[in-house]
């Protein structure tokens, strides 16, 4: 049919940016020359490792269906996308391993070394945690006790209701049993020749 008429460029292959890779190669060559010449290469100063101040989002895409085509950007494809390292990880455990790993931390500009805490910092942290625990315990004790009392009351009510229902059921069974015996005696069916006495 119309093989050349009105078609757009449907080439989905990745195009390499030659200029960018040329610059990287030149940079690597200059570093190698400096090593050979005996000049020490300046080590990159990295920050000490610090904790995250945000929550890692693992559940926003959970249960959603996404249509993926060849033109879909990598960040929207299946799995967890790391925008710092520009990579996709397929499951949450590997994603957590990745964001806690060396490569990711290096791309963030941090080393894997942790700042050494001083004695004062440790004491302050203990005080803060102790205050939190005391506040939590006070709230927890009162709320928990009230909850337990309510549950005990509900159980006692349910137990009483069950006993009353059983009492009623037994009384009804006794009445129907006695009526059946009387009816059988009137009709002449009492006992059917058994020697066992009914009480």
Swiss-Prot record:
Its main location: nucleus. Keywords: Acetylation, DNA-binding, Isopeptide bond, Metal-binding, mRNA processing, mRNA splicing, Nucleus, Spliceosome, Ubl conjugation, Zinc, Zinc-finger. Residues 27-46, 150-175 are annotated as: Disordered. The modification N-acetylalanine is found at residue 2. Residues 150-173 have a biased composition (Basic and acidic residues). SUPFAM superfamilies: beta-beta-alpha zinc fingers. It is found in: Nucleus. One of its GO terms (cellular component) is nucleoplasm. Gene3D superfamilies: Classic Zinc Finger (3.30.160.60). InterPro entries: Matrin/U1-like-C_Znf_C2H2, Snu23, Znf_C2H2_jaz, Znf_C2H2_sf. A zinc finger (Matrin-type) spans 80-104. It comes from the Eukaryota. GO terms for biological process: mRNA splicing, via spliceosome. GO terms for molecular function: DNA binding; zinc ion binding. There is a cross-link at residues 8, 36, 39, 45, 55, 61, 64, 70, 102, 123 (Glycyl lysine isopeptide (Lys-Gly) (interchain with G-Cter in SUMO2)). Involved in pre-mRNA splicing as a component of the spliceosome. Component of the spliceosome B complex. This is Zinc finger matrin-type protein 2. The lineage of its organism: Eukaryota, Metazoa, Chordata, Craniata, Vertebrata. The gene is ZMAT2.
